[in-house]
């Protein structure tokens, strides 16, 4: 559209292999990239909020996708028939994986669903023939149906998944795996992470703001896990704003 916030449709005939969506775009229309069979990579903008239905349907040469922070939902059939899709990174702002979102992604071998994902709709990972591992970090994630995750359907119409579901002890992932005879590996007991608690003392205090300030000044280095905890304002970056927000929470009400 005119203000460059809504990408309505991508020119399929354009033949581009790599494409960068403008940073001004906050929404990509349904079917916008459908059938773009030359596209191998696409960089999505940090301000994107929603991936609508069938947005990348049958982008058969697409190899990887990074879902940025801010996106809350992956629409139905969003990446269906992306046969060459090997790598998917989902941000911890996504709450829903839509119906058939990754259906027939035959090159996808592993995917991690962050704790933010609370709903996996029916057929989300149907017929993903090489999928061998799915990590589900939300212990209370909701699943819809026995054919939500499977590799293929056998001659008796059974939905077969030869891979492994990873989840926490006594989680809904474990319940799903046991109900539908899927392999399950426990990630251990679930411990809720307190965002901002860098010191690990169970509360947010001045020490946490100081540790973030040290990292900003190069006096210490955060692990990837610590970066997620330190990103207090959840903008995808650990910076001075996180330390300021923590300090604000400590001010008298």
Question: What residues fall within each predicted segment?
Answer:
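Intrinsic low-complexity repeat tracts in disordered regions, enriched in small/polar residues
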Residues: 37, 58-60, 81-83, 104-106, ...
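A structural signal for leucine-rich repeat
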Residues: 147-152
């Amino acid at each position: 559209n005119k203000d460059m916030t809504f990408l309505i449709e991508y020119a399929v005939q354009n033949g581009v292999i790599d494409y960068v969506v403008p940073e001004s775009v906050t929404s990509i229309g349904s079917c916008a990239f459908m059938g773009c069979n030359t596209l191998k990579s696409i960089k999505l903008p940090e301000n994107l909020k929603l991936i609508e239905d069938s947005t990348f349907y049958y982008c058969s040469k697409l190899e990887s996708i990074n879902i940025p922070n801010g996106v809350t939902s992956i629409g139905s059939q969003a990446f269906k028939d992306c046969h060459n899709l090997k790598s998917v990174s989902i941000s911890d702002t996504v709450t829903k994986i839509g119906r058939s979102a990754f259906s027939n992604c035959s090159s996808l071998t592993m995917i991690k669903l962050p704790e933010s994902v609370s709903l996996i709709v029916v057929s989300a990972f149907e017929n993903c023939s090489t999928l061998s591992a799915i990590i589900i970090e939300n212990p209370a994630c909701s699943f819809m149906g026995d054919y939500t995750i499977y590799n293929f359907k056998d001659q008796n119409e059974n939905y077969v998944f030869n891979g492994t579901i990873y989840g926490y002890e006594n989680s809904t992932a474990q319940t799903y795996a046991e109900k539908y005879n899927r392999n399950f590996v426990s990630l251990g007991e679930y411990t809720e992470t307190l965002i901002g608690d860098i010191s690990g003392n169970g509360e947010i205090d001045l020490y946490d703001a100081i540790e973030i300030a040290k990292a900003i000044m190069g006096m210490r280095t955060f692990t990837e896990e610590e970066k997620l905890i330190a990103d207090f304002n959840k903008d995808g970056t650990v910076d001075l704003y996180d330390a300021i927000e923590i300090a604000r929470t400590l001010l008298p009400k």
